[in-house]
Amino acid sequence: MSESSARTEMKISLPENLVAELDGVAMREKRSRNELISQAVRAYVSERTTRHNRDLMRRGYMEMAKINLNISSEAHFAECEAETTVERLVSGG
């Protein structure tokens, strides 16, 4: 969303000490409270989205690990069976 996009006005309540800190940052950076709060909310939403996506990926990797273990176990069984068959055929049994 760009800065020129439509806006919605909101009323929020913040602790006085947080407002004082916000005003100090706004003064030092020569920016408005609105700009700083918008930036903070964007950063928060972005961080939450990143964290959510990482959690989804972690779960996906865990599910794939189980699937891969099953496939590996099946392949191991097939390899052992093939080895036994080859040994039997080579020995003439």
Curated annotation (Swiss-Prot):
GO terms for biological process: regulation of DNA-templated transcription. It holds the Pfam family RHH_1. The keyword Iron-sulfur does not apply. Changing residue 79 to A: Still prevents EndoA toxicity upon coexpression in E.coli. Changing residue 68 to A: Still prevents EndoA toxicity upon coexpression in E.coli. One of its GO terms (molecular function) is identical protein binding. Keywords: Toxin-antitoxin system. InterPro entries: Arc_rbn_hlx_hlx (IPR013321), CopG (IPR002145), Ribbon_hlx_hlx (IPR010985). The keyword ATP-binding does not apply. Homodimer, forms a heterohexamer composed of alternating toxin and antitoxin homodimers which inhibits the toxin's endoribonuclease activity. Antitoxin prevents RNA binding to the endoribonuclease. This is Antitoxin EndoAI. The lineage of its organism: Bacteria, Bacillati, Bacillota, Bacilli, Bacillales.
